[in-house]
């Protein structure tokens, strides 16, 4: 009987040791898996945040000049000329009836996520992004400048999408053109328009669109294709598409409830 009890105790001890070892192994496996997942998520978060950032805007102009005229009167005249020049390029109208001028040229700046924009709108877009983040909203530039070839590619994809739904070629083309501009008539080809979406981690699309709708004008941007202006713009509602027109024009457009076509008609 004592021998039997001895063996029983030994077996019980072995089972206990085995179970304890299994628990420790499971615990270590959990800790390692949790650590790996945490590191991966941290890496992804940093990657996304880097992709949302615009390149730093230099505090001073890097050209050879000082940027300040010796004669105050000359400086005032230069400022007035710059404002006039900005109105000329920032208010250019591009739509189905007004294609991009044949000799139109643009100097581009590449953002940290690879998208490009007209270098002249860069500081305003940076200010917009900084203000949004300060309010707890995290946007990204999903699309900036496009070449003619890229615009054609997007158009072809949209036409194919409608054809797959059973539309004829003519119907598919007509429907696609309410969403995608015909190459040569897209504001993206100006470098003045950006499609802005949410980062997908800190903000939702609706949060970003709402913030932009209420605040973008303060930085010179307008919601180019609002839902109640489709008959005028010829483009369906796009809450992500924003166009730089300058702070003065954007403020008037916002407060008067206009689209760019209407604003330009009132300014004639």
Swiss-Prot record:
Listed GO biological process terms: cell wall organization; peptidoglycan biosynthetic process; proteolysis; regulation of cell shape; response to antibiotic
Q: What keywords sit in the KW lines? A: Antibiotic resistance, Carboxypeptidase, Cell membrane, Cell shape, Cell wall biogenesis/degradation, Hydrolase, Membrane, Metal-binding, Peptidoglycan synthesis, Protease, Transmembrane, Transmembrane helix, Zinc
Could you tell me the EC number(s) of this protein? 3.4.17.-
List the active-site residues.
238 (proton donor/acceptor)
Which residues does substrate bind?
151, 179-181, 186
The membrane spanning regions, by residue number, are 25-47
Kindly report the protein's main subcellular placement as a broad class: membrane
Keyword ATP-binding: yes or no? no
Instruction: Briefly state the protein's biological role.
Output: Carboxypeptidase that cleaves the C-terminal D-alanine residue from the peptidoglycan-derived pentapeptide L-Ala-gamma-D-Glu-L-Lys-D-Ala-D-Ala in vitro. Therefore, should contribute in vivo to the hydrolysis of the D-alanyl-D-alanine-containing peptidoglycan precursors. May increase the level of glycopeptide antibiotics resistance by decreasing the availability of D-Ala-D-Ala termini from the cell surface, which constitute the antibiotic target residues.
What's the name of the protein?
A: D-alanyl-D-alanine carboxypeptidase
Source organism per UniProt: Enterococcus faecalis (strain ATCC 700802 / V583)
